[in-house]
Amino acid sequence: MDKVQSGFLILFLFLMECQLHLCLPYADGLHPTGNITGLPGSKRSQPPRNITKEPKVFFHKTQLPGIQGAASRSTAASPTNPMKFLRNKAIIRHRPALVKVILISSVAFSIALICGMAISYMIYRLAQAEERQQLESLYKNLRIPLLGDEEEGSEDEGESTHLLPENENELEKFIHSVIISKRSKNIKKKLKEEQNSVTENKTKNASHNGKMEDL
């Protein structure tokens, strides 16, 4: 019974650890620094814009449109910090639907484990109560002859004769202990009776001798 309970406890702790690992979106200690796209329900987080006042210039900036587009593409393609880019690639993406399914299944499985443990404990207690009843009935129906007396009568067939084979060793030990205790009680009773008879004889002899001396 203790082994079964320890196994259930280890399994329950393992499931809870897996559940927490899956529920955390960034289990490796990495945090997002940029925009994560392609996820359901995820919104693009725009970085704060630093608004700086440019000085007024009294001449117009003249740039060609082709050069301006190429420059904007190069700045968009090359990340400002390569370590941030690698971290964004290594992030474990969060899946809320999968996490909910795993959470519900783990909770249901843990409830089923608890119910199974309770049922097994109830069955174990009922089996122990039945064994105690069988032992009590066996103790009541057990007949042990006194030392030196002959066995009389036939053995009665009752509930004590129909026992489970699993409990034979325990019943044998119990029967041996009962036999030893009853024999010791019988021996003590006989010794007390002998001592009482000896003391009675001594008192009778003493009284008889006193009467003879008086005569």
Curated annotation (Swiss-Prot):
Superkingdom assignment: Eukaryota
Protein name, as recorded: Uncharacterized protein C19orf18
Keyword Protein biosynthesis set for record: no
Species whose genome carries this gene: Homo sapiens
Keyword annotations from UniProtKB, A to Z: Membrane, Signal, Transmembrane, Transmembrane helix
Keyword Membrane recorded: yes
Stretches the record annotates as Disordered: 191-215
TM region positions: 101-121
Principal location listed in the UniProt entry: membrane
